[in-house]
Amino acid sequence: LLADKQELEFLQAVAGRLPEDIDVMRALGDLYTRTGAYAEGLRVDERLSRLCAEDPLVWYNLSCSLALSDRADDALEALGRAVELGYDDYEWMKKDPDLSALHGDARFESILEWIYRTFEQTPDYDEL
């Protein structure tokens, strides 16, 4: 799509001028993945995981990029790290198409089960 190509050119230019800008890197990584440029998206996500080592969303996105690159073991390791850091969106993780290569893997199912037991079953005290 022309709009994606223009956005990509714009973000690449901005990233060239602001190579350490986390928000620009996030947007660029997302756009690479959305447009099927998985290797480029993976490079951005790997860099973000070094710069933002305690950010669960960074690790979740890295897991997605790894899964899209047919690196299931590494994807599951990154996903585990995301969960350790607090990523808990069970519903999205179940249906995220970027993680579809992990579906059916016992380790993925175990991570989902742990999130469900830990976060989804916790009473919402605001509603009590």
Regions found by a protein language model. Name each.
Residues 1-8, 15:
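N-terminal leader/linker segments that initiate helical-solenoid repeat arrays
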Residues 23, 56-57, 85-95, 122-127:
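Boundary/linker segments of alpha-helical solenoid repeat arrays
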Residues 10-70:
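Alpha-helical adaptor scaffolds
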Residues 4-7, 21, 86, 105:
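Alpha-helix initiation and capping sites
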Residues 2, 93-128:
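Terminal, low-structured helical/coil segments at or just beyond the last alpha-helical repeat
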